[in-house]
A protein has these predicted regions:
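Active-site acid/base region of carbohydrate-active enzymes
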Residues: 3-28, 67, 80, 85-89, ...
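Amphipathic, soluble alpha/beta structural segments
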Residues: 107, 227-228
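Long, repeat-rich segments with strong aromatic
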Residues: 200, 207, 224-227, 265-268
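The feature captures the catalytic groove of carbohydrate-active enzymes
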Residues: 46, 92-114, 147-219, 246-259
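Long, K/E/R/D-enriched contiguous segments that form extended
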Residues: 231, 236, 246-249, 260, ...
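Substrate-binding groove/exosite segments of carbohydrate-active enzymes
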Residues: 2-134, 140, 199, 249-262, ...
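Internal glycine-rich alpha/beta core junctions
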Residues: 154, 263-265, 275
Length: 275
């Protein structure tokens, strides 16, 4: 407790107990890499099944970064980077022995692409330019893999229940698996995330003076923003939705629509309606 941030919040004893309990859980889940795993750093385990998860780790580190003086939690992501394939693919779930849980072309094999966000949040707090230089090519290669392997012919993105981390949401058409199938849909949250991440990687590139390496990301971000604005917004209900293969929109409102808050795809009137 002498090293970790100690909030001052008079009259909120229960909340403070929860805060310190969260740190106890975190510290209790620090793991050393198994011999031969290919992992390069001790890491913060997801505390689920012994595997590390791309989605979970990115969110956990948003909290754990405040404990950097105690332990280099951010290096948890280095184990994903170390397991990147030559074509840029990174599996979303990796076993403690370093084995991917899914084959790359499985619809549930990867995503959501949130690691660049986690890295930029860390950079904005600590200014670690050396780390930014190291992770930039890894993150750009992964983005390019998604663009090559997770898009329809019009450039929009697809995913799956496990690929989005929201497998309990009723969004795919009847007959498709809500967990394993892409449903021949344009997946709203995945497209918003890729738009958000493209701009973050461009920002990262400007800091590193390497933006020329990915300047095509700017064109993709504009394309995604226009498509989402023109095709995934429903004026009647004032909300954003997934799109089916026949061009109609899903009727299920999902929290994934609020990734739009990290983008500029909606105007003020639309945002006010959706919120």
């Amino acid at each position: 407790r002498q090293i970790l941030p100690s909030p001052i919040w008079d009259g909120h004893g229960k909340e403070m107990e929860m805060y310190w309990r969260a740190w106890e859980i975190a510290v209790g889940n620090i793991r050393k890499p198994q011999s031969g795993s290919g992992f390069v750093s001790s890491y913060l385990d997801t505390a689920y099944n012994g595997n590390i998860f791309m989605w979970d780790s990115s969110f956990i580190l948003m909290f754990a970064r405040y404990g950097t003086r105690f332990f280099p939690f951010q290096r948890t992501l280095d184990n994903f980077y170390a397991k990147q394939h030559p074509d840029g693919f990174i599996c979303r779930e990796i076993k403690a022995d370093g084995a991917d849980c899914f084959e790359r072309y499985d619809p549930v094999s990867t995503g959501p692409n949130l690691m660049p966000w986690c890295e930029m949040v860390y950079y904005h707090q600590f200014g670690d330019m050396e780390r930014l230089h190291k992770v930039f090519p890894v993150l750009c290669s992964y983005y390019k893999w998604l663009r090559l392997n997770r898009t329809w012919r019009n450039g929009t993105y697809w995913s799956s229940g496990w690929g989005t981390g929201m497998d309990n949401m009723p969004r795919v058409p009847n007959g498709y698996s809500p967990i394993y199938s892409h449903g021949h849909m344009v997946w709203l949250d995945t497209n918003l995330q890729q738009l958000f991440i493209a701009n973050l990687l461009l920002e990262m590139g400007f800091y590193l003076e390497r933006w020329q390496e990915i300047e095509e990301f700017e064109d993709e971000a504009k394309m995604l923003g226009k498509y989402i604005h023109d095709n995934l917004w429903d004026e009647k209900t004032g909300f954003l939705y997934d799109q089916y293969a026949d061009g109609t929109l899903c009727k299920t409102k999902g929290i994934g629509a609020y990734w739009a808050l990290f983008t500029n795809v909606l105007d003020t009137i639309q945002l006010n309606r959706m919120i």
